[in-house]
UniProtKB/Swiss-Prot annotation:
Belongs to the TRAFAC class TrmE-Era-EngA-EngB-Septin-like GTPase superfamily. Era GTPase family. Monomer. GTP binds at residues 12-19, 64-68, 122-125. It is a peripheral membrane protein. An essential GTPase that binds both GDP and GTP, with rapid nucleotide exchange. Plays a role in 16S rRNA processing and 30S ribosomal subunit biogenesis and possibly also in cell cycle regulation and energy metabolism. Residues 12-19 are annotated as: G1. GO terms for molecular function: GTP binding; GTPase activity; ribosomal small subunit binding; small ribosomal subunit rRNA binding. This is GTPase Era. It comes from Helicobacter pylori (strain HPAG1).
Length: 301
């Protein structure tokens, strides 16, 4: 059997549809999806097997990254570092651009990325045929920069095989790096954490989801049930009250939604205990961010 394997960084502006694309390719709910921008904060490996036209069995290890953006906030700098690290670690990059985006995001990507890359135009189901053709034509001015230009829709599963075929074509023959049926090397507790964060984005408005994080203090994995004890961290007491809601209505909704998603992913019952605490300025202090697993690379003179 002929095998290929390789790491592919999935890069794009916030809300380009990176996590939706990966969940569709995996046919599973692993990556955090939200209509709000900048929901993804940390790097996640997602493993997609694919048999290409040349008969190679390819193991494509996608590196799902936070949206490519620049902000002064320390947390956002940590997120940008994750994307830059993924580009450095990968053999190949895929830049995902929404059909509604201008070209500035791609131009920024070109200034940062030294690796060969594929340009994928996402959300084509949300535009007319004329609009898609016009956007493809606009990107053609950069045709010397990318390996291929692939229009697709993750939501409608359009042209996804074309993307995988193109990726596989540019991977080198190699033994597989992970077990055959593995979808991610993430621990279940980390996947559960992201599911709780996703529920925060689903049920809370304004800045609260961006000024919150989740810590799983205790995780007990049993044969028939997983027991999860987690804290939702916010920055202000006023935010804590909103997360809990009157008579606990908000935290109940968040908890129920998260638990049902956990049970679907883990394929077993889940007991979920959620607490809410206020920790002033946690997203602005480097020590607090390090404790939560966020790091960033400082510029060197």
């Amino acid at each position: 059997m002929k095998n290929k394997a390789g790491f592919v960084a999935l890069i794009g502006k916030p809300n380009a549809g990176k996590s939706t694309l990966l969940n569709t390719l995996l046919n599973a709910h692993l990556a955090l999806v939200s209509h709000k921008a900048n929901a993804t904060r940390k790097l996640m490996k997602c493993i997609v097997p694919f048999k290409d036209k040349e008969g190679y069995e390819s193991q494509i290890i996608f590196l799902d990254t936070p949206g490519l953006h620049h902000q002064e906030k320390l947390l956002n700098q940590c997120m940008l570092s994750q994307a830059l690290k993924a580009m450095g670690d990968a053999e190949l990059c895929v830049f995902l651009a929404s059909v509604h985006d201008d070209l500035k995001g791609y131009e920024e990507f070109l200034s940062l990325c030294q690796k060969p890359h594929i340009l994928a135009l996402s959300k084509i189901d949300m535009a007319t045929h004329k609009q898609v053709l016009q956007k493809l034509q606009e990107y053609q001015q950069y045709n010397s920069q990318f390996l291929a230009l692939v229009p697709l829709s993750a939501k409608k599963s359009q042209n996804l095989n074309a993307l995988l075929e193109c990726i596989s074509k540019h991977l080198i023959p190699s033994a597989w790096l992970f077990e055959k049926d593995l979808m991610s090397d993430e621990k279940m507790r980390d996947i559960y954490k992201e599911i709780i964060r996703e529920s925060l984005f689903d049920f809370l408005s304004d800045e609260i989801p961006y000024e919150s994080d989740v810590v799983i203090d205790k995780f007990i994995e049993e044969e028939r049930i997983d027991k999860v004890y987690a804290r939702i961290i916010v920055e202000k007491e006023s935010q804590k009250k909103i997360v809990i809601g009157k008579n606990g209505v908000n935290i109940k909704r968040i908890g129920t939604s998260a638990r049902l998603k956990m049970q679907e992913v883990g394929e077993k019952k889940v007991f979920l205990n959620l607490q809410v605490i206020a920790q002033k300025s946690w997203s602005k202090e480097e020590k607090s961010l390090q404790k939560l697993g966020y790091t960033h690379q400082r510029n060197r003179d």
